C-alpha cells in the first residue's frame, strides 16, 4: 500500500548549501522530518550545481519519512549568470543592464525545457526571452 502524504513543501535553496537553519528548519520542523537527513541528501544531489538556486518539492509522509524532487534553477537565475549581472533592471523598458546571445538563450531554454509548459524549443526560447525582457536583458 502507498504511503499517506502528510504535506508537500516547496522551497528554493542554494545548491549544496542546505543547513538546518531557516528556511529549511522552519519549513520541515513542524512536520517532524529529520532535517539533517534532508540537508545531507540535498547537498549530495546538488553539489554539481554550486552557485545556483535550486527549487525543491519535498513530499512528507504520515510516518515522517520524506522524498524530494529537485527542479531546474529559475530562468531569472540562469539569465543573470549568462549576462554576468547581479540583479535585473529597476526599469526594464528604459534601462538595459546586460546582453545575451541567441545561443545562450537556446542553452537556457534547453536546461529549462523539462520544467516549462512548452512543446518545442522555440516556444521555450520565447518564454525565456520574455523573462529576459522583463529583467532588462537584451538579446542580440
From Swiss-Prot:
Keyword Transcription carried by entry: no
Post-translational modification summary for this protein: One or more lysine residues are methylated.
Keywords assigned: Methylation, Ribonucleoprotein, Ribosomal protein, RNA-binding, rRNA-binding
Annotated InterPro entries: Ribosomal_uL11, Ribosomal_uL11_bac-typ, Ribosomal_uL11_C, Ribosomal_uL11_C_sf, Ribosomal_uL11_N, Ribosomal_uL11_N_sf
GO molecular function annotations of the record: large ribosomal subunit rRNA binding; structural constituent of ribosome
GO BP terms in the entry: translation
Matches recorded under Gene3D superfamilies: Ribosomal protein L11, C-terminal domain, Ribosomal protein L11/L12, N-terminal domain
Taxonomy, superkingdom: Bacteria
Gene Ontology cellular component terms for the protein in this record: cytosolic large ribosomal subunit
CDD domains, sorted: Ribosomal_L11 (cd00349)
Subunit: Part of the ribosomal stalk of the 50S ribosomal subunit. Interacts with L10 and the large rRNA to form the base of the stalk. L10 forms an elongated spine to which L12 dimers bind in a sequential fashion forming a multimeric L10(L12)X complex.
Function: Forms part of the ribosomal stalk which helps the ribosome interact with GTP-bound translation factors.
Sequence similarity: Belongs to the universal ribosomal protein uL11 family.
Name of the protein in its database record: Large ribosomal subunit protein uL11
Protein's organism: Thermoanaerobacter pseudethanolicus (strain ATCC 33223 / 39E) (Clostridium thermohydrosulfuricum)
Amino acid at each position: 500500500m502507498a504511503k499517506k502524504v502528510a504535506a508537500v513543501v516547496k522551497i528554493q535553496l542554494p545548491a549544496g548549501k542546505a543547513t538546518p537553519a531557516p528556511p529549511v528548519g522552519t519549513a520541515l520542523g513542524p512536520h517532524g522530518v529529520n532535517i539533517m537527513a534532508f540537508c545531507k541528501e540535498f547537498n549530495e544531489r546538488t553539489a554539481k550545481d554550486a552557485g545556483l538556486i535550486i527549487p525543491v518539492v519535498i513530499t512528507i509522509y504520515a510516518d515522517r519519512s520524506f522524498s524530494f524532487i529537485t527542479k531546474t534553477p529559475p530562468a531569472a537565475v540562469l539569465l543573470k549568470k549568462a549576462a554576468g549581472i547581479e540583479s535585473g533592471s529597476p526599469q526594464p523598458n528604459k534601462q538595459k543592464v546586460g546582453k545575451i546571445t541567441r545561443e545562450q538563450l537556446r542553452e537556457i531554454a534547453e536546461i529549462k525545457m523539462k520544467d516549462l509548459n512548452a512543446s518545442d524549443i522555440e516556444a521555450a526560447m520565447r518564454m525565456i526571452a520574455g523573462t529576459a525582457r522583463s529583467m532588462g536583458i537584451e538579446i542580440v
